[in-house]
């Protein structure tokens, strides 16, 4: 345990450097300076004059480039896109101060570690981090992975832990290999699902929440719409980095497209028993040991909707039952890949807990899975939409297999542009929904601890 006197001494003498002032870099810069650390930052050199004016009143110091950050900093954090990490470390890494500590914030650590090992001076320690949440989420209580990859100086690890303590996150210690496997297991399939959903809606040019109570109405639909739009309100590289640079993610995204295709084939071939057997096996594998409360309940699911319609003012019109192919394919993928999503809850992002929650709800709410299978076989109201969804899932799988950031960016931004007019409202509702769901899941965890 580091003494308070030691931490105060570090704050008075040490400098934290941040290369890259995107959303997460800025979050770290503000959190660290608010906690009393000296922070020096830079972004791309051509933005210097603009950012100097923008952050004139900020507590951190802004300099022109990463060379100036690297020469002065005792802990350097590269907060840059995964696609650029190697190039940027190659440029600024050799300027690192003697004996400094270096880390990064990318969502896939293999290329980051490779860049550090290749371009950093041998006297640098490598202790890297990953906050498993977005910049709009409160850092308190969220998972923060710390990877002590190379430490020659005993105080280095204690120092990084002391710096990160101001985030009030749950610190999790992993190797970079463990980190990459876990992030793929918890994010690759679920991101593919909601990217494909948004892509399918954009292709058929509909905002699903505007169609009244007939289609895409109700609790599960609220979450699907809100999460899909939340993903498309972020920057494309947030998801591209994980999907393209993480080898484990490739297999999982391919499996998601395969699961969606195979389940859809069973639906259109009217193979009800085969579909039922397959989904019950998936249910047993993923949820067989589940006890206690569900992560989500009806009250939360019904509360947050973009739709202006309601059952009460629509002549008692009932929503058309949905096949929920996108959610069925998530659970089937976990089953086919042998992934137990509950194994990684300590490293789960806020969005992953919601993905797991809606999947849990669909498979464990009494009668709902059976109703969903019945709708998939006997009610063809969603068949055209499901076909478009399968095409979108396969497209995303192909984009990832090409490992081309430009193609990924183009695909993502074309869908983003379609939803752009709706994103501000969706973000407001989505933020409230996420806050409520995370609070509910914390309450559930506390209740289960009391009962054990």
UniProtKB/Swiss-Prot annotation:
InterPro entries tied to this protein: 6-PGluconate_DH-like_C_sf, 6PGDH_NADP-bd, NAD(P)-bd_dom_sf, Preph/Arog_dehydrog, Prephen_DH, Prephenate_DH_fun
Pathway entry: Amino-acid biosynthesis; L-tyrosine biosynthesis; (4-hydroxyphenyl)pyruvate from prephenate (NADP(+) route): step 1/1
GO biological-process terms attached to the record: tyrosine biosynthetic process; tyrosine metabolic process
Keywords in alphabetical order: Amino-acid biosynthesis, Aromatic amino acid biosynthesis, NADP, Oxidoreductase, Tyrosine biosynthesis
Location of the Prephenate/arogenate dehydrogenase domain: 14-297
Induction: Presence of Phe represses the TYR1 gene expression.
UniProt GO MF annotations: NAD+ binding; NADP binding; prephenate dehydrogenase (NAD+) activity; prephenate dehydrogenase (NADP+) activity
Enzymatic reactions: prephenate + NADP(+) = 3-(4-hydroxyphenyl)pyruvate + CO2 + NADPH
Domain of life: Eukaryota
Residues where NADP(+) binds: 14-43
One Gene Ontology term, aspect cellular component: cytoplasm
Keyword match Membrane: no
Note, other: Present with 2180 molecules/cell in log phase SD medium.
Family: Belongs to the prephenate/arogenate dehydrogenase family.
Protein name: Prephenate dehydrogenase [NADP(+)]
Species whose genome carries this gene: Saccharomyces cerevisiae (strain ATCC 204508 / S288c)
Gene it is expressed from: TYR1
